[in-house]
């Protein structure tokens, strides 16, 4: 019979090393077998040479090489306070230490000198826990002296994340020019570009005699594209420091040409300033506004969707109920244009020319210059710093082909060339100096199989008949050089390639949808709400929230809206965040 006894029994005493160290510490305290004395200016600390050698490369090199200390019974440790050496020796023999604000700096220096890496990192962790916007800049300088990269990186991360508070600290104005430039060019900087400019001005004015020449280099670090044109051209362009610099005025003029001319190209020198958003500040968020919700009640709600938490946040309500207004955003400001204003009390309605604006900075609705012509059921589209209002229904209740353009720089509307054909509910998008109006319906509600193209710089229209276009009540959105037309009493999704002048079929939606909204965030198409035909061909309102990825040609559900909604606006707005965007 085979033996069942265990021939091999591996055993490891988990407590032996701890007990061994404990007993060695007792021997040290009783000065038994100690063979070396560490000397400071006012103290002598007996130790075991082999324990020191085993604990640190510094002592191993000292005692195991041909240094004179290898044969000495007494070793002087100059430049380290006695209480610090005592703490280090206690740490060597026990593995424990209490770090305080009074002790941390000399302890960190000693740990660095004596090559106790874990103790050094423990001190670094302690200092990282003390970080705040007021001391992070001094912590960065300290980390450079101590050569502590982990502390330096954490302190710099706080400096760019809490830039508003850091810029107000006393240490900020003492930064050198290279240090300030390093912060201002950081993609992680959590600040709006207006504040970036104001901060560099404050730094220069702290010592204007020696710093005013730095405006050339500092101004290049401001991402000018993300500054509102009014602030840029009325405040920044007129600042005496900016005007004193030829380079700054040349940059301002280049930006002016880019904003005012639809055909201007971005120069190589200006491109970093113009095209690159910061990872922290340029987080696009989805805003859903207006429309008709549950039981066709006109809604005053404005909602913001947080992709990270996947939750909806309520913004300030519209000042009044508007039926079939147009919605557009430009320079991170939401515009609600025109519409049919409704009174729930009297039941009266009036065609409106009013323009309301909402900024996420203030979360308050304001009025801008009203349109020249009241209209509703119209379309609005933005291009550069312009907003175009196209068609709709006017005060005479007739379908209009008129077009007007709003200049956000000067808060002015002007009449533009009318559309060749008046249509209702077309899909409209702007790309590459042109506005495209796809389909829609005529006064008799017949689909119009037509593409109308407006050349912005020439103020001229052209038209192209095509049987591919048959959309009504469908939104359009631009991703790269393709205009996506989504649904419109159909499940169909098609992409119009503006360069190749051809249509490409995409994956269909799940339902035949109309009166929905679509927008683009991070090169993905987000579709919200609308109405759809169910399996019994009955029209129902929808709270659907879906996303289309053109790279994979796949639709995914993002959940649902807080309520069923159609004839609303769906727009991307940029909000400031102190968390980075995912790579």
UniProtKB/Swiss-Prot annotation:
Keywords assigned by UniProt, alphabetized: Kelch repeat, Repeat
InterPro entries reported for this sequence: BACK, Beta-prop_ATRN-MKLN-like, BTB-kelch_protein, BTB/POZ_dom, Kelch-typ_b-propeller, Kelch_1, KLHL38_BACK, SKP1/BTB/POZ_sf
GO cellular component labels: Cul3-RING ubiquitin ligase complex; cytoplasm
Protein name, entry field: Kelch-like protein 38
Segments forming domain BTB: 34-101
Residue ranges of every copy of the BACK domain listed in the record: 136-237
Top-level taxon in the UniProt lineage: Eukaryota
GO biological process, one term: proteasome-mediated ubiquitin-dependent protein catabolic process
Protein's organism: Danio rerio (Zebrafish)
Kelch repeats (start-end): 285-332, 333-385, 386-433, 435-481, 482-523, 525-575
Statement: the UniProt record of this protein carries the keyword Repeat: yes
A GO molecular-function descriptor: ubiquitin-like ligase-substrate adaptor activity
């Amino acid at each position: 019979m085979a033996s069942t006894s265990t021939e091999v029994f591996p055993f490891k005493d988990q407590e032996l090393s701890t007990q061994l160290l404990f007993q060695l510490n007792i021997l040290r305290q009783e000065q038994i077998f100690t063979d070396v004395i560490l000397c400071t200016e006012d103290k002598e600390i007996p130790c075991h040479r082999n324990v020191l050698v085993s604990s640190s490369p510094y002592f191993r090199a000292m005692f195991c090489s041909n240094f004179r200390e290898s044969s000495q019974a007494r070793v002087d440790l100059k430049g380290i306070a006695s209480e610090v050496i005592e703490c280090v020796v206690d740490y060597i023999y026990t593995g424990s230490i209490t770090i305080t604000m009074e002790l941390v700096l000399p302890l960190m220096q000693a740990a660095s000198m004596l090559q106790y890496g874990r103790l050094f990192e423990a001190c670094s962790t302690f200092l990282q826990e003390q970080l705040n916007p007021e001391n992070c800049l001094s912590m960065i300088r300290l980390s450079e002296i101590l050569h502590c990269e982990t502390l330096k990186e954490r302190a710099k991360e706080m400096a760019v994340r809490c830039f508003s508070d850091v810029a107000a600290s006393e240490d900020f104005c003492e930064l050198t020019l290279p240090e300030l430039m390093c912060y201002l060019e950081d993609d992680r900087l959590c600040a709006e570009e207006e504040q970036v400019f104001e901060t560099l001005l404050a730094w220069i004015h702290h010592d204007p005699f020696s710093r005013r020449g730095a405006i050339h280099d500092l101004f290049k670090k401001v991402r000018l594209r993300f500054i509102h044109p009014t602030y840029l051209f009325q405040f920044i362009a007129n600042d005496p420091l900016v005007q004193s610099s030829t380079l700054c005025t040349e940059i301002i003029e280049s930006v002016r040409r880019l904003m005012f001319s639809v055909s201007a190209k971005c120069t190589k020198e200006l491109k970093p300033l113009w095209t690159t958003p910061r990872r922290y500040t340029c987080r696009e968020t989805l805003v859903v506004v207006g429309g008709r919700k549950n039981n066709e009640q006109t809604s005053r709600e404005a909602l913001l969707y947080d992709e990270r938490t996947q939750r909806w946040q309520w913004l300030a309500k519209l000042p009044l109920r508007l039926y079939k207004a147009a919605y557009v955003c430009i320079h991170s400001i939401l515009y609600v244009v025109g519409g049919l204003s409704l009174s729930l009390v009297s039941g009266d309605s009036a065609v409106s020319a009013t323009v309301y604006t909402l900024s996420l900075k203030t979360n308050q609705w304001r009025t801008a210059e009203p349109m020249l012509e009241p209209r509703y059921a119209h379309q609005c589209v933005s291009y550069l710093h312009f907003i175009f209002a196209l068609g709709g229904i006017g005060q005479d209740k007739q379908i209009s082909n008129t077009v007007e353009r709003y200049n956000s720089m000067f808060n002015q509307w002007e009449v533009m060339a009318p559309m060749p054909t008046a249509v209702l509910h077309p899909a409209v998008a702007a790309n590459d100096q042109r506005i495209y109006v796809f389909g829609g319906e005529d006064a008799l509600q017949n689909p119009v199989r037509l593409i109308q193209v407006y050349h912005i710089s020439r103020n001229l229209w052209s038209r192209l008949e095509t049987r591919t276009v048959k959309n009504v009540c469908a939104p359009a959105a631009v991703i790269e050089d393709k205009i996506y037309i989504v649904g419109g009493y159909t499940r169909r999704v098609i992409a119009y390639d503006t360069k190749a002048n051809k249509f490409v079929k995409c994956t269909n939606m799940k339902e035949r949808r109309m009166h929905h909204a679509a927008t683009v965030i991070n090169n993905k198409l987000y579709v919200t709400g609308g109405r759809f035909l169910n399996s019994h061909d009955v029209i129902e309102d929808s709270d659907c929230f879906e996303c289309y990825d053109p790279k994979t040609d796949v639709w995914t559900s993002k959940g649902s809206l807080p309520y069923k909604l159609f004839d609303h606006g769906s727009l991307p707005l940029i909000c400031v965040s102190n968390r980075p965007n995912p790579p």
